[in-house]
């Protein structure tokens, strides 16, 4: 066996918590970029940084490339574990009360077209304090509400009738929305 290599199997996945789904009337590339924008929006607020610090997350600031790249992109409370553009993004995190993953999957919606955006949460909550934390986060519906809000934000961003192309600045963007003619 070479140094640094182990033949141990990967750890089993964390226990399933929930999955939320939303249909998006846009192509998969637009939904991928919208998901990245929605994550940036949700985790760029000072309250997200304060919360990540309060519960003891290793990652409590946003950083790295956008859209997310595995091992290089972080959000408060999360690090990007894997990214398969434009189909799957897995974020992982850990703090004093929980270890968790949040996996976003983008599937073609049949037969009407568009994209099915899914958010799957897996987590463990060790010990009595972890159990109390689970009750506070899951039992109150807070996690479900925030997940649905994030998915709705991604849908609204992806379905905008006009938006800048990735990497395009406001100065380079056309003055009118597609389909409009100047007056």
Model-derived features: positions:
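Short, surface-exposed coil-to-beta transition loops
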Residues: 17-19, 75-76, 98-103
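A short, structured loop/turn motif at beta-sheet edges
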Residues: 25-29, 82-86, 106-116, 156, ...
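Hydrophobic pocket/interface hotspot
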Residues: 31-35, 80, 119, 154
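Intrinsically disordered, low-complexity segments used as extracellular stalks/linkers
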Residues: 164-168, 172-182
């Amino acid at each position: 066996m070479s140094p640094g290599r182990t033949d141990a199997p990967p750890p089993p996945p964390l226990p399933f918590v929930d999955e939320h789904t939303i249909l998006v009337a846009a192509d998969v590339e637009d939904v991928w970029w919208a998901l990245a924008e929605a994550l940036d929006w949700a985790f760029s607020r000072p309250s997200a940084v304060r919360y990540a610090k309060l519960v003891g997350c290793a990652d409590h600031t946003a950083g790295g490339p956008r859209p997310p790249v595995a091992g290089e992109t972080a959000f408060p409370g999360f690090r990007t574990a894997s990214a398969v553009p434009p189909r799957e993004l897995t974020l992982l995190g850990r703090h004093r009360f929980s270890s968790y993953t949040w996996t976003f999957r983008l599937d073609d919606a049949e037969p009407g077209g568009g994209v099915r955006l899914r958010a799957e949460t897996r987590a463990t909550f060790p010990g009595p304090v972890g159990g109390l934390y689970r009750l506070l986060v899951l039992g109150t519906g807070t996690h479900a509400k925030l997940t649905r809000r994030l998915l709705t934000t991604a849908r609204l961003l992806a379905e905008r009738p006009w938006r800048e192309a990735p990497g395009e600045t406001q100065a380079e963007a056309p003055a009118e929305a597609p389909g409009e003619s100047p007056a």
